Amino acid sequence: MIVLSIIALLVLISVLFYHRVNLYLSSLILLVYTAALSASQLWSFWVLLPLVIMLLPLILTPLRKSLFSAPALRIFRSVMPAMSRTEKEAIDAGTTWWEGDLFRGAPDWKKLHNYPKPQLTAEEQAFIDGPVEEACRMANDFQITHELADLPPELWDYLKEKRFFAMIIKKEYGGLEFSAYAQARVLQKLAGVSGILAITVGVPNSLGPGELLQHYGTEEQKNHYLPRLARGDEIPCFALTSPEAGSDAGAIPDVGIVCMGEWQGKQVLGMRLTWNKRYITLAPIATVLGLAFKLSDPEHLLGDTVDLGITCALIPTHTPGVEIGHRHFPLNIPFQNGPTRGNDIFVPIDYIIGGPQMAGQGWRMLVECLSVGRGITLPSNATGSLKSVAMGIGAYAYIRRQFKISIGKMEGIEEPLARIAGNTYVMDAAATLITSGIMMGEKPAVLSAIVKYHCTHRGQRAVMDAMDIAGGKGICLGPANFVARGYQGAPIGITVEGANILTRSMIIFGQGAIRCHPFVLDEMAAAQSNDVAAFDKALFGHLGHVGSSMVRSFWLGLTNGRTSATPVKDSTRRYYQQLNRLSANLALLSDVSMGVLGGSLKRRERISARLGDILSQLYLASATLKRYEDEGRQKEDLPLVHWGVQDALYQAEQALDDLLRNFPNSVIAGLMRVVVFPLGRVHRAPSDHLDHQLAQLLQVPSATRSRIGRGQYLTPSEFNPVGLLEAALLDVIAAEPIHKRLSKEAGKSLPFTRLDQLAKHALAEGKISAEEAALLTKAENSRLRSINVDEFDASALAANPVVKKPAKQQQTEAA
């Protein structure tokens, strides 16, 4: 009985940790339990004495502070890693949303389900159905990318007229003031037609003068610039990146010096600016330049501080000395992008966004706005492009036949088709969920990094899959090619607004560990202010959190999450439970990694990357489940849900395993493996059978397939190859029953080619009606249009054709 009572005590302690019961109530429960066993004479009353001695220093706050918290604070202050001003501002900027729940080890799934489903207003829907549809119709991507290297003038005029560049600008300034969800849907639709079109519209509606002015501009700046930006009278760009500072934007060498100078015939307080920027979208044609630079005030004209820090200003590009106009040539996706320079240019101090009082506040301004823009523009462009490619390649795989069958029925093709379908569904779910947070007023900095990374990364891999399936159809550029420009341009999204290698290795977990953790940010703040009381509260909350995560990880590992709470009882129930387990694992290993590695974790980028991978996969899986919930739990969509969640669970577990195999302290890693994987690994990648289901969903018209391509431009217009493929798919499907009947009558399988000739002969023999003959002929025309590739005159492809000189007439000499 004594052994059983000790086991019961250990179970009781574990239950208290598992449910995160506070220290005072836990101490009371343990004392009552011990007293009860002592009263039953199973234990001696003397057992209470050591228990009280252990608990008193923990529950008496003044004693706890002096014995534990104060010494711990001194140690923490000595080992806390140095943090630059830009790092601190990046961490302080923005908010924590759903990713915080996932990081803390016990997600509140009901809270996730209760987040409002984003909806379009009638005005937003009308804009998408009208002006956006028309802009898509006007866009000829081959003309844009190959012939003009720009949008045609009439499309530029249309975008300005319909205020495409003013989606984020408030109505009081003449803007559209659309929601984040509406912006995402607009960009997705445009991206499915032309990457250049989507980038051109997306950038002014992301991080740029419009966004910065609305948040930080003076009233005079707002009233002057915002109406002009809304009308398209001003074309904005924002210059941050320098040749010497790409991903390390805080190291920009561009400078401004506060001084007095002459401006329009008067001596005014201003700045002398010198900059050299590159990769700046819209810079070649911009009329107003948003500029980030490091401002200094050596003469103390603004105050006592000399090095004020990163500052943002608006510079009209007609200002003497401003250099714009040259262009970069990014991967045959020639959107307006180029360098800008200026040397010792004097401008008034009022050019600072927000006026002189915002001098030195530029980095905070940028990271606060970036968390919103990065969560909308790049994920939407990547997702929209893939949604259209998915529809096109699904139709093509059905139409294209080899060895007398549709290539989409071949297992080798089904595998990449499934990845395309699954990733399209997951990416759209992830991009949609973050817009919910933004519409609720959140600025989820960590989540925007997750969505940017995984949408662009998965999008690139999926477009590569589509190119493999398309083969020669995808290789040959021309108006009929629906995949090659997306394939060429995918690295652009990978690179910009935080290169993906940097984002994965440093940002997702680097910021997440501090922002999303329930106690680390408070501990750091207490350490910086040397506040023992605040540190005591955070420290003991942190210790309880670690204990809870360890108990939860071990128990949920033994049961594979089966005892944990879920919001539903259907076939997705187990997914919530398995995510509960992985969330607890992440919480535990994050604390262990920070505790063991300390400040060196900043330099252990592969450890940080794997922890970030776990957090990312938790988000992608939960976004997939949220989408399924928001769309009414359509059972026909379950294969997509199964694939998305199973893939995320498998990748998260793989990251856990890789983390433990490569953890620098092998003893700690071994102990953690016992806690996290008490019965070994349990998750598998999606099965071949599930891949087969997804491949079929992508090829055959259905409500589920329509949801995969929701909101895209699928009209079969002249310059929309995806829309033409969609129409061809319907034509081919309509012809198949007729072809099958004729094959049966012929007693053999007739080839699904030359259907027009088949129709002619069958009609002459009275085997089919005129209507059926017309269907076969139409299907043949659509089939040939779908599988053929573009061809050009030999001289049409050269940018600068070589003019051949007339050959000299050769004279033959007599022998």
Swiss-Prot record:
Gene Ontology CC annotation, any one: cytoplasm
Active site per the UniProt annotation: E497
GO BP terms in the entry: fatty acid beta-oxidation using acyl-CoA dehydrogenase
Catalytic activity: a medium-chain 2,3-saturated fatty acyl-CoA + oxidized [electron-transfer flavoprotein] + H(+) = a medium-chain (2E)-enoyl-CoA + reduced [electron-transfer flavoprotein]; a long-chain 2,3-saturated fatty acyl-CoA + oxidized [electron-transfer flavoprotein] + H(+) = a long-chain (2E)-enoyl-CoA + reduced [electron-transfer flavoprotein]
Keyword list, A-Z: FAD, Fatty acid metabolism, Flavoprotein, Lipid metabolism, Oxidoreductase
Protein's UniProt name: Acyl-coenzyme A dehydrogenase
Gene name of the record: fadE
One term of GO molecular function: long-chain fatty acyl-CoA dehydrogenase activity
Required cofactor(s): FAD
InterPro entries: Acyl-CoA_dehydrogenase (IPR050741), Acyl-CoA_Oxase/DH_mid-dom_sf (IPR046373), AcylCo_DH-like_C (IPR036250), AcylCo_DH/oxidase_C (IPR009075), AcylCoA_DH/ox_N (IPR013786), AcylCoA_DH/ox_N_sf (IPR037069), AcylCoA_DH/oxidase_NM_dom_sf (IPR009100), FadE (IPR047634)
E.C. code: 1.3.8.7, 1.3.8.8
Entry similarity comment: Belongs to the acyl-CoA dehydrogenase family.
Protein origin, superkingdom: Bacteria
Alphabetical list of Pfam families matching this protein: ACDH_C, Acyl-CoA_dh_1, Acyl-CoA_dh_N
Annotated function: Catalyzes the dehydrogenation of acyl-coenzymes A (acyl-CoAs) to 2-enoyl-CoAs, the first step of the beta-oxidation cycle of fatty acid degradation. Is required for the utilization of medium- and long-chain fatty acids as sole carbon sources for growth.
Pathway(s) of this molecule: Lipid metabolism; fatty acid beta-oxidation
